[in-house]
Each structure stands twice: as structure tokens, then as C-alpha cells.
Design a protein with these regions (language model features):
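Short, hydrophobic alpha-helical packing/hinge segments within bilobed ligand-binding/sensory domains
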Residues: 25, 97-98
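Short, flexible helix/strand-to-coil boundary loops that buttress conserved ligand/catalytic motifs
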Residues: 15-16, 50, 120-123
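Acidic, PIN/NYN-like endoribonuclease modules and their adjacent C-terminal/linker elements
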Residues: 87, 95, 102-110, 114-137
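Short, flexible loop segments at the rims of nucleotide/cofactor-binding pockets, characterized by
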Residues: 13-14, 56, 84-90
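Short, well-structured N-terminal submotif of metal-dependent ribonuclease cores
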Residues: 1-38
Length: 137
């Protein structure tokens, strides 16, 4: 079974855009099509982003917290990995995702962030639509 790290932007998109590829990935996750790998840092970032004022029109604080708990229930929660020998992410704030993907040896780091997608030559990075298509093959 494939294993994947979903970037925070994918998890947020899945919640606020229920008809998109990111939301369909969560349906596939619940159907057992792949294993989701998360870490405390990823979960903390997800919670922090969903608590931002600009997301109030999409989700309440209570519903955001419930969503994070569902993600925890449906995922393998790994310890935050140590930093790698050198950053390779274009954005230092994304380095923890790269480190998690490397240490957990996932089949894909799934992101909608162009800077993360630019790492394709060094990591198995896919967009939500690409990863969804790979599950359907």
C-alpha cells in the first residue's frame, strides 16, 4: 500500500474545497487506498493555519480542531524527524515536510506548493491530482 505525506496546503484544501482533488484524497485515505504519514510539526502547522481568522468563513475553531483529530485518527503519527544535513526545500518553512518524507520513506510527498513541487528531481513529489491518478492506476 502506498504511503504519503500530505502537505498542510493539501489538508487545508481538502477541508475547504470539498469537490477538489485534495478532498478526494481524503476519501481514498478512508477507503484504505494509501497510508497517511504525519508528524507533530505538521499537525501543529495544520491547526495553526486553520485557526487563522481568514479561515473562519470556512470552518469554526471547534470544527478545525475536530478535523485535526480525524487526521490523527486516520494517519500514522511519527515523531518529528531530525533536520537533514542541509536544507533542500526552497522555503525553509517546508523543510520539515522534506525531512518527514525522507525519514518515513513515503512513496509521495503530495503538495500544491510550487516550491515543493520543484523538488521532484530529488524527492517523490506529486500534486494532489497526480497522486490521485496514481492511486487509480
Amino acid at each position: 500500500m502506498p504511503r504519503a505525506v500530505l502537505d498542510t496546503n493539501v489538508l487545508v484544501s481538502a477541508l475547504i474545497t470539498p469537490a477538489g482533488a485534495s478532498a478526494r484524497l481524503l476519501v481514498e485515505l478512508r477507503a484504505g487506498a494509501f497510508e497517511l504519514v504525519v508528524s507533530p510539526a505538521l499537525l501543529a502547522e495544520l491547526r495553526e493555519v486553520l485557526h487563522r481568522e481568514r479561515f473562519r468563513r470556512y470552518v469554526s475553531i471547534e470544527d478545525a480542531d475536530a478535523y485535526v483529530e480525524v487526521i490523527i485518527r486516520d494517519a500514522e503519527v511519527m515523531e518529528d524527524p531530525p533536520a537533514t544535513s542541509g536544507p533542500i526545500a526552497g522555503d525553509p518553512d517546508d523543510q520539515f515536510l522534506v525531512d518527514l518524507a525522507r525519514v518515513s520513506r513515503v512513496d509521495a510527498l503530495v503538495s500544491g506548493d510550487a516550491r515543493v513541487l520543484d523538488l521532484r528531481d530529488r524527492l517523490p513529489v506529486q500534486s494532489p491530482a497526480e497522486f490521485l491518478a496514481s492511486l487509480e492506476d
